[in-house]
């Protein structure tokens, strides 16, 4: 072993490296866990730099502790992630230190912290469409309007990674 680093819930199911090989994105496949972003540019000094959890919390009674990430894939500046009963999320990872969910589609009418629902989301078609497979509902073909998050939607510094002094340019 050259190096190791624990993930947020210590139950990593998958990992995907960024196109520049500097960042690793992981999913911990347990209820209430996260997609993690890690700086692996120096494998002897791995750093956790951000965690994100599917925000809709459409698990049982809307509880965040019921969301379970399954697999994430890097597609350019985005992470496309299957989330069991919460469907598919698209995360802007152009800044791996500040992961922002920009889109989601719930494939499953089911709820709760179980392993039903969306098992996979494949973003690599030449058309840009995403294929999502749901164990109970079947195949979904999703059009995803990829677009960068500009930091304009969050205004509560206590609720998000928001810098009130930051400037954005169009």
Positions of PLM-derived features:
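Feature marking well-ordered beta-strand scaffolds used for ligand recognition
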Residues: 1-151
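Primarily marks secretory-pathway-exposed extracellular/lumenal segments that are disulfide-
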Residues: 134-136, 145-170
């Amino acid at each position: 072993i050259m190096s190791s680093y624990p993930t947020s819930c210590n139950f990593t199911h998958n990992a995907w490296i960024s196109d520049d090989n500097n960042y690793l994105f992981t999913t911990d496949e347990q209820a209430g866990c996260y997609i993690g972003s890690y700086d692996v540019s120096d494998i002897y000094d791995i750093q956790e730099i951000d965690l994100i959890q599917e925000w809709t919390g459409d698990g049982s009674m809307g509880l965040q502790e019921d969301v379970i990430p399954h697999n994430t894939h890097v597609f350019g500046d985005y992470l496309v992630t299957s989330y069991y009963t919460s469907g598919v999320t698209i995360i802007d990872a152009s800044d791996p230190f500040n992961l922002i969910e920009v889109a989601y589609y719930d494939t499953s009418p089911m709820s709760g912290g179980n392993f039903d629902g969306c098992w996979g989301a494949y973003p690599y078609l030449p058309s840009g469409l995403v294929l999502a497979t749901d164990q109970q509902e079947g195949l979904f073909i999703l059009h995803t309007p990829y677009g960068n998050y500009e930091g304009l939607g969050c205004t509560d510094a206590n609720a998000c990674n928001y810098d009130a002094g930051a400037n954005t340019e169009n």
